[in-house]
Amino acid sequence: MKIFCIGRNYVEHAKELGNEVPDEPVIFMKPKSALLQSHTPFYYPEFSNELHYEAELVLRVSKNGKYINERQASKYYNGITVGIDFTARDIQGELKKKGLPWEKAKAWDNSAVIGKWKEIIPEMLKKPISFSLNKNGENVQKGITTDMIFSFDQIVTNISNYFSLNIGDLIYTGTPAGVGECVVGDVFEGYYEQQRMFELEIK
């Protein structure tokens, strides 16, 4: 299983971090060991002093593919949920200054939170999908697919031009504005529309 992540896929998020808006998807990856299943404890990593949350819609790949046509891309994923791409922002900042890869900041064990899955039916993809993240009962992030720079199908097509997609692969499709720091004791809840997909406490 591979975990693909898309960076800077919402204009306002790119701006809040001082990044340029990309003209094609920014792709990075996490290993299988980064996946944290729902209801599993999450522990603040000892190597970071600035841990940030990034809520995202996540797709589950349901069909093997390579060089996928955008018009056929929706046939290659059948599940959707909300997850968190946890980022050691202090480590990322140091790596970016040196022009180094981000894995130490993004791909460590349990850094990819995943909620319960919702099966996709075609009608779901014909209207905008909204999602949100609450921190200690207060909303901190809201996103909607119409604000994405690259759509689900564009993302799938672009990834498949470089990597083979396999059944069970996951695609984190990017985070909206509102990312921020978290501390031990914070409780996060991720929502797909009005449906809660996960609850997570930082320990």
Question: How would you describe each model-predicted region?
Answer:
Residues 1-162, 166, 170, 178-203:
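Catalytic-core "active-site belt" of small-molecule-metabolizing enzymes
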